[in-house]
Amino acid sequence: MKNKYCLYEKDWQKAKAALLLAKNFGLILDDSLEALEERRKEKNEENRHKQEKGELFYGPCFYTPPMYLQYELTRFRLDFVQPSEKIKQLGVCPSFTREERLNFYENNHDLFGRYHGDYFTFEDVEQIIDKRLREEAYDKLIQNILCQSD
């Protein structure tokens, strides 16, 4: 069944770790392949009904297995990076001090350049830095799960 998701083994392990993390956070009830497939079918059915009613909706009319897996993995990541209410309630998303954000800005100054060689000010990119730091924290949580399963 996992072959229909078109992933190499390493990527599949990372996807399973993200599903487990989402389950641990209460974003999904079941991290199994069968449950993933069931959620995909439900989403496709929901989109079909919206399309029949002429309602506007965001995204494709039909999700293939690889598309839906990527949709869920992206959604879980965004729920952490831009903390959803559920993630906020759990208190698992880190907050960062101004000093930590400023340190990231100074160590990654090249990320904040513009076309003509000038740079965005720290204040202009502070929210972006917060998101990047939360992405790193999310990746570490996934990595911890992968290390535990080795």
Q: How should these model regions be labeled?
A:
Residues 1-68:
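N-terminal targeting/tethering segments
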Residues 53-150:
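PPIase-associated folding chaperone regions across multiple families
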